[in-house]
């Protein structure tokens, strides 16, 4: 007689598994590193797809479980199978009629999920079943946008080959006007940028994003591939202005080396020097003035870079600008001088510097106000802060 304990029947295994999931699914799923961990209200099929026993999923489908079941976020069993990268389950659900184009509450399809997680094999199954590579989420994002943002190069290449949009997918814009190249630049995804550039994608906007995100390698790559160095964003800023605002001195050097014009103004009249001075980026200011940036350029409010540096209390930057000949008593909006702006913000050291460089404490604004500190009288001039010749000495390229 066989002394071995008989194996439970398949039906019993599946029934035990389902009962376990009903009682303890939240604890079990909460140990996973991605995807949903709170499954209150999930039906049996959604739980089985996420838990993963293919035999149980098959049994539930035979018992009439709906492939169009939804969770709280509007995701179908197909969404969850794709999120897990579980190709056999994806194939099974598709064979049982799961709608390949179903969208969740955010407008995302299963192909969006595959693109986000880089599941190339699963994406291929979806595309073979007619998934649209041109599908857009609620914010206008296509699967290609997501693949580009996350650096899934092989998947991005497959999406560009998909029927429908084809190469034109590279120029599709989301709700903010970004293309796949913008998203790749934001993440510094050089391989994806190479793929897109080889297909003729526009790169000017991507250059601006690379500068704004501080992605130096992407910025250099895009310049080498022909992106226009003085392209402008919707606010009129160039890559040089965006890099200056971040104080990215190496990027500034690269852009200047490619012929970037430091005199270009944005729609508020601000030059790259205005932006660097306002943020207190001394090295960026030094680079720009050494390359001929206009030290007394005025924005639409009549403010010079010295006004901006003084208002924010950037005393070293103010000293550098004064060393380069900035007008200490330049008047701007409401006839305010740099001294007025530094004083009303309570920047004592900057006030002392300006006074030591000859700023007049008697000049009055449009409202006949002289410069005054919040606590009362102006501090004395601080001559020791006024020498400052070293602040704006010529800068050697750090190339």
Curated annotation (Swiss-Prot):
The keyword NADP does not apply. It comes from the Eukaryota. Residues 377-399 are annotated as: Disordered. ANK repeats lie at residues 40-69, 73-102, 106-135, 139-168, 176-205, 207-231, 235-264, 268-297, 301-330, 334-363. InterPro entries: Ankyrin_rpt, Ankyrin_rpt-contain_sf, Dendritic_Spine_Reg/Scaffold. SUPFAM superfamilies: Ankyrin repeat. Keywords: ANK repeat, Repeat. It holds the Pfam family Ank_2. SMART domains: ANK. PANTHER family: PROTEIN VAPYRIN (PTHR24166:SF48), ROLLING PEBBLES, ISOFORM B (PTHR24166). This is Ankyrin repeat domain-containing protein 65. The gene is ANKRD65.
